[in-house]
């Protein structure tokens, strides 16, 4: 009887904090104010205008996506590594290493992991985020693609030419105002 009453009291009640399954990383909210030494990274053209780099859920290992300013990650480049400055532990942006570097696929997947990326180097070109590696020739080191589910890919082809179906060409840039905006 007692357990029935307790179950009835909690039926339909939502938990205020996320609950992780055993062994799963716990998502932590991104600060809404930029931390010292970090930048927001966002697209500045449609259809992803002011969509920000992050993972879903926020600040855990997973696919790199461009999404809402309300859950934006905060980043900087350290020794060629793009690092999420607000995740604990830090997350590093990884790039898929193709089997045939001389003829790579048009898209190279990106994701965040707790270990340092072993393939390529990230750099700023002005405020633009670039990625390069000597073994993969690219026409534009600042060319990215946003594809299904807002996933971010390295574009190994020409920017805005023969864009793969379901993807859009994008460049992404740092933004250093105190708060991310829409």
Sequence positions of predicted segments:
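Extracellular glycan/ECM-engagement signal in secreted proteins
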Residues: 21-61, 112-182
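Fungal secretory targeting signals
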Residues: 1-24
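Surface-exposed charge patches in extracellular/virion surface proteins
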Residues: 49, 69, 78, 101, ...
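Short, well-structured hydrophobic secondary-structure segments
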Residues: 56, 64-102
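Intrinsic-disorder/low-complexity peptide segments enriched for small residues
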Residues: 7, 13, 32, 75, ...
């Amino acid at each position: 009887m007692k357990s029935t009453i307790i179950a009835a009291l909690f039926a339909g009640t939502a938990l205020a904090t996320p609950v992780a399954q055993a062994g799963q990383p716990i998502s932590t909210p991104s600060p809404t104010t930029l931390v010292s030494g970090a930048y927001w990274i966002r697209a500045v053209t449609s259809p992803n205008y002011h969509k920000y780099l992050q993972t879903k859920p926020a600040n855990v290992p997973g696919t790199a996506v461009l999404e809402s300013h309300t859950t934006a990650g905060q980043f900087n480049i350290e020794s060629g590594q793009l690092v999420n400055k607000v995740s604990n532990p830090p997350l590093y942006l990884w790039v898929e290493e193709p089997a045939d570097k001389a003829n790579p696929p048009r898209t190279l997947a990106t994701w965040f992991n707790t270990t340092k990326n072993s393939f390529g180097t990230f750099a700023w070109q002005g405020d633009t985020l670039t990625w390069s590696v000597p073994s993969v020739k690219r026409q534009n080191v600042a060319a990215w693609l946003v594809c299904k589910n807002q996933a971010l890919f390295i574009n190994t082809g020409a920017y805005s030419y023969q864009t793969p179906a379901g993807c859009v060409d994008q460049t992404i840039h740092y933004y250093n105002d105190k708060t991310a905006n829409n």
